[in-house]
Amino acid sequence: DIVLDTDGKPVNNGGQYYIIPAFRGNGGGLELTRVGRETCPHTVVQASSEISNGLPVMIAALPRTMFISTAWRVSIQFLKVPTCTPKPSYWHIPQDSDMEGSVEVRVDERFPLEFRIEKVSEDAYKLMHCPSSSDSCRDLGIAIDEENNRRLVVRDGKPLLVRFKEANQDSE
C-alpha cells in the first residue's frame, strides 16, 4: 500500500511532512526536546500542545520510487533542528538511552532504515521500529517520563496512531 497524507495524496519518497496524531485529544505532532542531562535536544517527543504540528521530517526509502510504501523500511530525519543538534538528524533507537526503546536523533552516515509505516485504518497509520539485525518490527507509542515528556518509545501493542501532514513552505 502507498502511504497517504492528510489530503489523501501519496507521501513522497524524500518528502517533508509533520507526523501528527490521527486522533485529537492527546498532544500534537512529533518534535525534539532535551531530557535528563542532554545539553541539546536529542529526544523525540510528542508536543504537549494539541495545536502544534511538531517539527517537519523527511521520510525516505531506498527504492528509487516516487512514493512511500508500507512494505518498505524508511529513514526518518528531522529537518529544522537547533544548531547544536547533530545533523543529519536521523531517528535512531540507541542501546544506551536512559529510557529503554526511546527514539533519539544521532548522526548516522549510513542512512539508517530502522522504521516502517503500517496502515491501521482508513485514516490512521502506526510507526514501527525494525532493528537492522532483525526481520521483526515493534510498535512505537508514547511513554511519559519523570519530566512529563511524552516520549516516543517502543511500546508493543500500544502504538501511537498517526497521520502525515505535508509540510509546505507556506504553512510554517
Curated annotation (Swiss-Prot):
In this chain, the site described as Reactive bond for factor Xa is at: 64-65
Query: A Gene Ontology CC term for this entry?
Result: extracellular region
Q: Do you know which PROSITE patterns this protein is assigned to? A: SOYBEAN_KUNITZ
List where in the cell it is found. Answer: Secreted
Transmembrane regions listed in the UniProt entry: none
What are the GO MF terms of this UniProt record? serine-type endopeptidase inhibitor activity
Q: Which cysteines are joined by disulfide bonds?
A: 40-84, 130-137
Q: Which UniProt keywords apply?
A: Disulfide bond, Protease inhibitor, Secreted, Serine protease inhibitor
Q: What is its main location?
A: secreted
Record's function text = Inhibits bovine trypsin and chymotrypsin, and human plasmin, plasma kallikrein, factor XIIa and factor Xa.
> What is the similarity comment for this entry?
Belongs to the protease inhibitor I3 (leguminous Kunitz-type inhibitor) family.
Name of the protein in question = Factor Xa inhibitor BuXI
